[in-house]
């Protein structure tokens, strides 16, 4: 009997044996992050943690890549109708209309409203990190911008050798809210990426210690499944204790305070003079053209 795949608004969930599988499922938009995705992610992670049959949580993306970051076309172009979501609590920080008004260059920016939204998104991503059970992320194609928040919040990465991983919004209009780059690759390499907005391929990610496994596309699924199966053989109690033990190292290094700064800085980055200018460019010429003009001088147009 085949396991039943449950389809939510932004992802799918299923359990096969000892593995809970969460698949980002917006391939037509590059699995772009919406306000709903972090909350659905957290709900699925909690469900897996409460399932006595699940030992390990697998995260992957449907389509040509893992995740291209936030789905910003409507918001960056200030298309109020394009981002309306009738199921969002009206007037709340999660109401896209509230956030659209808060990003209007002609209006007044409320940093607390911004923080309330982005901190909740971060909580959703960090559910992978806080999960008692281990989380393993498969990266293929592209994993850029906000997509790296989900990947870096996972315990282990299995990546395609040619995958592109990075944070291009470091050039304008963004700061990584998870603030995990320095913890995952060290301060010097984190600065190398964030001070340029450059990306690395999967092979480099493995060399830097960011990825635990790397494989060509034809072998990626096999390598991913092999690791999941090995983890799935370990008793849940052992997995929980060892993950908590290692995570405590990051807690003691000030991760929570660093992330609070990352969330605030991300909001500020979207409201600096150059941030407003870039948003105005997106409103006038379209989001894709604004990204092209941002990235073309660096020779890597189209990475996020």
Please report, for each region that a protein language model flagged, where it lies by residue.
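Crotonase-fold acyl-CoA enzyme core
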Residues: 126-239
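Glycine- (often His-adjacent) and acidic-residue-rich active-site loop
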Residues: 61-123
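Charged catalytic carboxylate motif
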Residues: 36-40, 120, 127, 223, ...
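C-terminal alpha-helix plus adjacent terminal tail
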Residues: 1-17, 78, 84, 200-202, ...
């Amino acid at each position: 009997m085949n396991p039943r795949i449950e389809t939510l608004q932004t992802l799918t969930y299923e359990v096969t044996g000892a593995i809970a599988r969460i698949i980002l499922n917006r391939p037509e938009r590059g699995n772009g992050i919406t306000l709903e995705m972090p909350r659905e992610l957290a709900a699925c992670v909690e469900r897996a943690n409460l399932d006595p049959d699940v030992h390990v949580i697998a995260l992957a993306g449907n389509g040509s890549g893992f995740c291209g970051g936030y789905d910003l076309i409507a918001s960056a172009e200030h298309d109020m109708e394009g981002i309306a979501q009738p199921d969002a609590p009206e007037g709340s920080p999660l109401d896209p209309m509230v956030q659209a008004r808060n990003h209007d260059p002609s209006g007044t920016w409320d940093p607390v409203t911004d923080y309330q939204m982005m901190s909740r998104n971060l909580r959703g991503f960090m559910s992978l990190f806080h999960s008692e059970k281990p989380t393993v992320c498969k990266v293929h194609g592209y994993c850029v911008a906000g997509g790296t928040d989900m990947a870096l919040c996972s315990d282990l990465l299995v990546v395609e050798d040619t995958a592109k991983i990075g944070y291009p919004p470091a050039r304008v209009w963004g700061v990584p809210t998870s603030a995990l780059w320095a913890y995952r690759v060290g301060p010097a390499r984190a600065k190398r990426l964030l001070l340029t907005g450059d990306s690395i391929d999967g092979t480099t990610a493995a060399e830097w210690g960011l990825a635990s496994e790397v494989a060509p596309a034809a072998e990626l699924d096999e390598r991913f499944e092999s690791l999941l199966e090995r983890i799935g053989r370990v008793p849940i109690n052992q997995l929980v204790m060892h993950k908590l033990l290692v995570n405590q190292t990051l807690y003691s290094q000030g991760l929570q305070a660093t992330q609070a700064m990352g969330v605030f800085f991300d909001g500020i980055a979207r409201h600096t003079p150059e941030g407003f200018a870039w948003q105005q460019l997106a409103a006038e010429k379209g989001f894709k053209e604004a990204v092209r003009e941002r990235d073309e001088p660096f020779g890597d147009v189209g990475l996020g």
